[in-house]
């Protein structure tokens, strides 16, 4: 493991500006390549039931954004792949690691329903079960880009890459509705950005930073530390289009947002590592995506470059928990 004293998180880091070389931030290119595809932003909405559904997946794919469909309506996944392909769109799904999921992988392979992306999505991804699932997918569908996670250590990244994963997802419980750290004592909460840095250093393939993103500036910080893509939950929750239920409180509209390991998700109170919260209604998802793009373009201009690669080279300072100076976000 790296020097455990050098841990930091998003609010502890400030990036240092370089001389600007573009006339307008609109010249900055925020696109990113993942596998054989190029996407508009290095951002993917979390594959959670209160964040993404079929409609949002279609909208994102049509507009040139990356998406990962959640795995919580397992029986609809084959039809989802078919529907996306019929429209000439990429299919990007999630799977678990149990026997029924292996049967599903064999089934879509036999039916030639080959998704472009499969994300193996479990809470503790440094596991033999994940390695076996990677190997199964790669044996049956070698052309499919496999994302595996979630992990929090360089050792885990190396092992999953060696098993055949094309990218790893880094983050154990730093998310807003994840309580893994409280329930188990384990996780990357409080040092998620350092975990991204260490894991990216060990990686030879893309790393997706997953969890703990509270502001658009955190996306730039993730890229600085080596992430290719950033998975975002709470910032994408509670939009007009979001699947979460709308609730009215004191004349204000809110939407539900819950974790993938919450009892609301599982439908039972067993091994619960997530909770449910209400977030203020945020308007249109397209507006948020546009604002994210503009903020990232500004980040690139501050980095002194023309595209995302500029962010990987900037200097930064560690300002222990003080960038807010007591202000709320």
From Swiss-Prot:
An annotated GO cellular component: GMP reductase complex
Keyword field contains Transcription: no
Keyword NADP: yes
Pfam family, one: IMPDH
SMART domains with a match to the protein in the record: IMPDH
Residues the record lists as binding NADP(+): 207-230
Active site, renumbered: 178
Biological process according to GO: purine nucleotide metabolic process
Record's catalysed reaction(s): IMP + NH4(+) + NADP(+) = GMP + NADPH + 2 H(+)
GO MF annotations in UniProt: GMP reductase activity
Function summary: Catalyzes the irreversible NADPH-dependent deamination of GMP to IMP. It functions in the conversion of nucleobase, nucleoside and nucleotide derivatives of G to A nucleotides, and in maintaining the intracellular balance of A and G nucleotides.
Name of the molecule in the record: GMP reductase
Upper classification of the organism: Bacteria, Bacillati, Bacillota, Bacilli, Lactobacillales
Gene encoding the protein: guaC
């Amino acid at each position: 493991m790296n020097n455990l004293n050098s841990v930091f998180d998003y609010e502890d880091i400030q990036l240092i500006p370089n001389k600007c070389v573009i006339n307008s931030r609109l010249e900055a290119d925020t696109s990113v390549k993942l596998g054989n595809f190029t996407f508009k932003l290095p951002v993917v909405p979390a594959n959670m039931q209160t964040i993404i559904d079929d409609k949002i997946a279609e909208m994102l794919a049509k507009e040139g954004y990356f998406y990962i469909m959640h795995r919580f309506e397992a029986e609809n996944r084959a039809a989802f792949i078919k529907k996306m392909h019929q429209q000439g769109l990429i299919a990007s799904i999630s799977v678990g690691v149990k026997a029924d999921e292996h049967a599903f992988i064999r089934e879509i392979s036999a039916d030639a329903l080959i998704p472009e992306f499969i994300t193996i999505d479990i809470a503790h991804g440094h596991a033999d079960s994940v390695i076996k699932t990677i190997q199964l997918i790669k044996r049956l569908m070698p052309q499919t880009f496999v994302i595996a996670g979630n992990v929090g250590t360089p050792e885990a990244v190396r092992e999953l890459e060696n098993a055949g994963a094309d990218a790893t997802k880094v983050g154990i419980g730093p998310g807003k509705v994840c309580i893994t750290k409280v329930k188990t004592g384990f996780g990357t909460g409080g040092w998620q950005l350092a975990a991204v840095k260490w894991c990216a250093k060990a990686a030879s393939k893309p790393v997706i930073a997953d969890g703990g993103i509270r502001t658009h500036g955190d996306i730039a910080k993730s890229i600085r530390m080596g992430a290719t893509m950033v998975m975002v939950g709470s910032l994408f929750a509670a939009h007009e289009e979001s699947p979460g239920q709308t609730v009215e409180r004191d004349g204000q509209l809110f939407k539900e947002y819950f974790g993938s390991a919450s009892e609301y998700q599982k439908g039972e109170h067993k091994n619960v590592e997530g909770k449910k919260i209400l977030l203020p209604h945020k308007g249109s998802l397209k507006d948020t995506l546009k604002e994210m793009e503009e903020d990232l373009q500004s980040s690139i201009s501050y980095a002194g470059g023309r595209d995302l690669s500029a962010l990987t080279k900037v200097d930064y300072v560690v300002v222990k928990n003080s960038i807010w100076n007591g202000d709320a976000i």
